[in-house]
Each structure stands twice: as C-alpha cells, then as structure tokens.
C-alpha cells in the first residue's frame, strides 16, 4: 500500500464528503529526496466544520503520526 493509499484510509475515519490528496514532492527535490514526502490534503468533513484551524490540523496530524515517523516530511491541509 502506498503512502497516498494509507493516508486515504486513515482520513476515512473522518467520513469526508470530499478529500483530495496531492503529492507535491516533485516541487521539493532540490532540498528533500523522499517518495511522497510532501503532501497536500484538501478535505471536507462534518467533524471538521466549525473548529479552529489549529484544532483541524491537530486532528489530521494525529491521524497521520505514523506517516510523519516514516518519511512524511511536510503536510499542507486545506479544510473546505
């Protein structure tokens, strides 16, 4: 299972209406050489609505802690 697939599976607990996971690693090859190391997430889920930006980022980052411990270098999150 690829990192993208693992992230999709982990985010599924939020029951998103919409989720898009974009690998932006190609933009960062000059300073970081990793496969699926820079990820952008665009997501809409009822559980995230009405919460602060920090609360949403904490929720998502906590779901992905294993990915950060295994090579995920940067995560951009956009809650829609």
Each PLM stretch: what is its role?
Residues 1-80:
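N-terminal, polar/charged subdomain of small-to-medium soluble alpha/beta proteins
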């Amino acid at each position: 299972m690829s990192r993208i697939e693992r992230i999709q599976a982990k985010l599924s607990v939020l029951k998103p209406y919409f989720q898009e996971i974009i690998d932006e690693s190609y933009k960062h090859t000059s300073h970081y050489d990793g496969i699926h190391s820079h990820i952008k997430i665009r997501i809409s889920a009822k559980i995230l609505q009405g919460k602060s930006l920090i609360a949403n980022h904490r929720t998502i980052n906590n779901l992905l802690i294993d990915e950060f411990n295994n090579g995920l270098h940067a995560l951009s999150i956009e809650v829609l």
